[in-house]
Amino acid sequence: MITARRVVQFGFLTLTVAGVFVFRGNAERWCPFGGVEALHTYVTEGNLTCSLAVSNFYILVGVLVMTLALRRAFCGYMCPIGTISEWLQRGVARLGVRPVRLPHKLDRTLSLLKYPLVAIVLFFTYKTAELVFRGFDPCYALISRHGEDITFWAYVVSGGIIAGSLIVVMPFCRWLCPLAAVLNPFSRFGFTRITRNEEACVDCGKCAVACPMAIPVHKVRQVTAARCLSCLSCVEACPAGETGVVSWGPPGWVGRRWPVGILIAVLLFCTATAVAASYLFPLPSFAKTRGWEPAATATAELRIHNLACRGNANLLMYYLERDDVFEIPGYIRLEAWPDPGAAKARITYDPLRCDEAAIKRAITEPYYDALGGLWRLSPFQIVGYDPLGITDGDATRDP
């Protein structure tokens, strides 16, 4: 069981690192907490915050479904922060350093910190429509390739998590993780659970010692704690072995264990379904319209550099609505999928009043700022568009 879990952890951690540093992907759009952060702006404006995408909603739904089925198994098997934190503790344990076990009441008190923390994060995120705490986020520091929007404090927080993980088992996951605060109400009603056969149990307490979330497994008949990761460490630690004194499965399955393969299959199914849905139903994360839609329209599908976030998408719409010699008359609708690389943009326009060439000029030509009395260069470059015949790798080539 434990070996299978470590293989899954290694697989998802490798996938995350390779996706970010090898394939230069935008891992932020696959963060389930991003779906929580983006919800208010998407409902009220139809747009998403920063470089988040509709895929954040799909993966959030997938994680919620797996939480209702398996409790917080996402945290125990898939989350890179949880995996790194747990492996750090396992590494120092092999050196003979035992983790500090806090008194139960103190541990439970500290675990309440994540609820006001998530409330503060969501309040300011919803109020400003920006990821105001992104620069302090240890997970973003890991998956961002250390971009310019990472602050010194992100490394301080990350260092604190690393240092804490050497002393206490998974401290961030237990006490501070905002996603854990979101998942806990769903995990409370999780279908599967750990069950202890009270009649056969010898009360050795090894199951509780093995639990990374400090759940007193040896004192309950069924583990209903929302913080359970379904990691099955308690099941593995039971000296009774396969007799089923400590078992995992649906309610009432005392003395019988479900195969761990079922748990992993549910995790992979929920994840694969969420990823497939994001590609089958690729809704834009930014949409804005000017004017009334005519009877006939044309569409330009472009790949644009420096269209990395919601703010850049608003700036792109500003260029499309310019009122100088490159003005585009009539109807305009911009749908965008912001991305740190070459982002996709779909621009719908009135073909009787302009054409695709005019759209491209409006996006890339300098803009005269009448109030400032100066020309402003466009920050955007369109992949494959080189009006001056100058070959610039970044401006004309999709990375």
Question: What are these language model-derived features?
Answer:
Residues M1-A210, V217-H218, E236-N306, R310-D398:
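Non-ligating segments of multi-cofactor redox enzymes
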